[in-house]
Amino acid sequence: MLKLLRPRPWVCNSCLNRVAFPKPYPVGSRSTRWLSTAQSAAPAVSIPPVNPVPADHTTSGTHDDALLGKIFDCSSAWRDFSARSAKFPTENAGLFRNAYLTSPDGFLTFAQSSLSKASAIVNRVLGASTIEEYKTIVRDLDRLSDLLCRVIDLSDFVRVTHPDVRIQRAASEAWYMVYQYMNQLNTMTGLNDQLGKAMENSDVTKTWSEEEMAVAQLLKLDFMKSAVNLPQAARDRFVDLSQRISEIGSDFVNEMAPEQRRVVLPSSKFQGMDPQIARRFTKHGYMQLPTMSGEAAAALRTVHDEETRKAVYLAIRTASSRSVGLLEALLKHRAELADLAGFESYGHMTLRDRMMAKTPESINKFLVELSKNNAPRVLQEVDSLLQEKKTLLASPSATLNPWDREYYIQRIRNAQGKNVKHDNFFASYFSVGRVMQGLSRLFTRLYGIRFVPRETLPGEKWHPDVRRLDVVSDTDGHVAVLYCDLFYREDKSPNPAHFTIRCSRAISEDEISEAAVSTSEGGPAFGSPESAANDGMAASRGASGGPLKQLPTIALVCDFPQRDNPLSGSKSKPASLTFASLETLFHEMGHAIHSVLARTSFQNVAGTRCATDLAELPSTLMEYFASDPSVLSLFARHAETDEPLDYDLLAERVRSRGRFEGCDTDYQIILAMLDQAYHSPLASSESFDTTRAYHDLQREHSPLGPDPSSTRWQGFFGHLFGYGSTYYSYLFDQVLAERAWKKVFSSGQDGAALSREAGEHLKESLLKWGGSREPWRCVSDVLRDERIAGGGEEAMALVGSWGTSNKSTMKH
């Protein structure tokens, strides 16, 4: 049950595609065992009470707005703002203001304290026997999940982000301790039995809210997927298979390799390639080009000789036999796991949980319709490539081969690019501070919330570059905390990501009373029982004084280049973003705002803990705002002259970049279909051949045709491990995001991208619900389209028929 409750951090598809071998989020990569030495308890310190709404939030929005830009763009302003922390008490407040985390030792204390509370809840649930006790089971199980996720989510983030190795190690220990406890709970049938009794009793369920019932159903599905209803021998086999899948999947991703490590040809064959690159890989007149490298990909775009491009292409598209063998072992183990759990296939098993599609059949309907919609655009793009080749070779009979596509795409783009501004030109208009101002101004107009810079207490952040922003609502006061770690460091992951450190959840008065008692018995000294109930982290009763809620606490991590050290005394230029980086920041902020606005009472359905194939909708929709002229007018001004950006120049850049989006979409459709085929009942067949399945899909559904028969690219499809049977989600949300942009925000016409009415509609119909409401109902309400309200195969097919347009051709 509980192993599925912690969501992965949102490392998005567009970000993962930047690297040759996308890896799943590290699990256990920092530490493989517990340290044998005993850890002492964290020292008791006095934590000042946290105001529900910080005092400086009453200042004018104009002041907050100006300060927001300065702390990201101006070195001296950031130094001065950082120095304000000196006015606070010198005691260490703990990482994220978690009072346990004042030292590495505190992670163990935090984990032990959380497990003690969790054990008490487990005993209470197992001992429930009266109607009144069964009524609280969902809240008890949700709190149990929250206690474990408090440790796991925070520790998972810290162990891969914090620069201090001692703290990384301590966080890994805490993570493993709680994860092991979760595995123990997953083998207990009693929790599942008790939840089942509660759900079968109408006297119990009639008192549950819609949100409570949604959580109960999710928990029941999680239990089912953990096979707790099976006999002991079958459960043991289930655990063993799950472990084998994890091990094989990790090997598949981490050890994937090409069959041919290098392409070795005479250097004269590589004319057209950057001479500096060519010299670097040339020895004794031969180019030795590493197969899986950026330089090999560049060769496909630039080398004039077709036979050389063919050799490079075949090498790049042919995974080693070991890589393919690992993939096929992974798929067969997954098929066996699904069969053991009583499902027709692994796809059927996965889609039962937190998914809109529900069945593989629905997904295939969506993908087939999307492919039909996209095919004319692909054919048009391919024809333009073929005409370019015929013209270059002066050969009317020339044909287009797979190794030609990137080369002729680059030729066409180069010809168009003479009138297109380079990314460096636009970066002058996108300083990080101005962009953050723009995002705050946008969210103020859409949702009535803004970003307010907040001084940090000693020990609160993991690096001096980190800025804390409090998210403040016009009506509800302080609603979330956002930690921004946006600038490049050598020890940081290059993948931009949104991390939920703590979810929204209502804290009961009983919990506050328990916290008051436990505080008196030792441990960190909190300023109040309310503060103790949330470990010292941000909580609020709202502007109206309602129930206490733990506030969403979010970390946004990027790797934007910084001109110099912002804490140095030298004068510096502000860090600036390319347009691609601007889109990335808007995308990740879409996830963050989803977490902020979906402040549910149950953490299981808070924020981005919604249907997996819905979670990318808010973030993908945000990308449309990044290229909207009315939104850009909020912040896009030249760093030195303060001149506004000429939108026509950016529009031309966007059009050029989107010239071959049809081919890109076709490629993603085939991968999504392949993911479905690999996790279908076919995987159980002794004759199952992943290479043949891939080429057959290309032949049947892609206007581009199949890869050469000698290739086996599927051995490089690392997403199959982390996103097994759900790879379609990105395409699905791209279609829905475009539809929402058109139907809710009128494609930005007449300033509609800044419409409060449209923003409130999006929030009330979709964003505020998190995962607590039927997702098809949410999407239907957003789009004002009752045809899809019931979901199912017909709704999926209809969404696929809407297709995706080239963003560059959409009117603003």
UniProtKB/Swiss-Prot annotation:
Enzyme Commission number: 3.4.24.59
Organism domain of life: Eukaryota
Cellular component annotations (GO), alphabetically ordered: mitochondrial matrix
Keywords assigned by UniProt, alphabetized: Hydrolase, Metal-binding, Metalloprotease, Mitochondrion, Protease, Transit peptide, Zinc
Protein location: Mitochondrion matrix
Family from the record: Belongs to the peptidase M3 family.
Protein's UniProt name: Mitochondrial intermediate peptidase
Protein source organism: Pyricularia oryzae (strain 70-15 / ATCC MYA-4617 / FGSC 8958) (Rice blast fungus)
